[in-house]
């Protein structure tokens, strides 16, 4: 089984996501469509690792927006997100390949992290990288050092990226 551990803020929404009502939980339809295309290509299951899982309103909103979750990582408030992912994996030995998509690096150093910028959300380049990784075409993840993030943001702005 293939699994994507998904953060939502900064991945399925970004600084450019329209939110005229200033709702606390919002998904950008363009970014969600890109994510759904990734899921269709890979057949991966989605485990929510986002802070949205702590709040019933967040979980409701994820379902309302159509985020296709099968499970959530355990709530370990004194532990980094890395430990929550590893605890979930320990309970699910049938996972052969997984990726973490998160705009932050919460001690995810030794996990396959694909890290979009919160300014752009999930880009097509990162979605392709995740798909290639889950399909075993590469072992390269896409974590971003600060300078890489700056360059990604410049590139996205030059392309007039709209989410």
Which residue ranges define each predicted feature?
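Short, active-site-adjacent cap segments at secondary-structure transitions
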Residues: 12-13, 54-56, 106-108
């Amino acid at each position: 089984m293939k699994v994507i551990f998904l953060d939502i803020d900064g991945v399925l929404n970004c600084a450019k996501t329209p939110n005229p009502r200033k709702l606390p939980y919002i998904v950008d339809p363009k970014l969600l469509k890109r994510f759904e295309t990734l899921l269709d290509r890979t057949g991966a299951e989605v485990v929510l690792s986002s802070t949205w899982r702590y709040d019933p309103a967040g979980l409701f909103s994820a379902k309302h927006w159509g985020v296709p979750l099968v499970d959530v990582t355990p709530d370990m408030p004194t532990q980094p997100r890395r430990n929550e992912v590893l605890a979930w994996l320990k309970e699910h030995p049938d996972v052969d390949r997984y990726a973490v998509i998160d705009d932050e690096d919460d001690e995810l150093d030794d996990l396959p992290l694909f890290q979009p910028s919160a300014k752009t959300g999930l880009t097509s380049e990162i979605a392709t990288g995740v798909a290639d990784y889950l399909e075993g075409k590469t072992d390269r993840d896409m974590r971003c050092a600060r300078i890489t993030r700056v360059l990604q943001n410049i590139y996205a702005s030059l392309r007039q990226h709209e989410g």
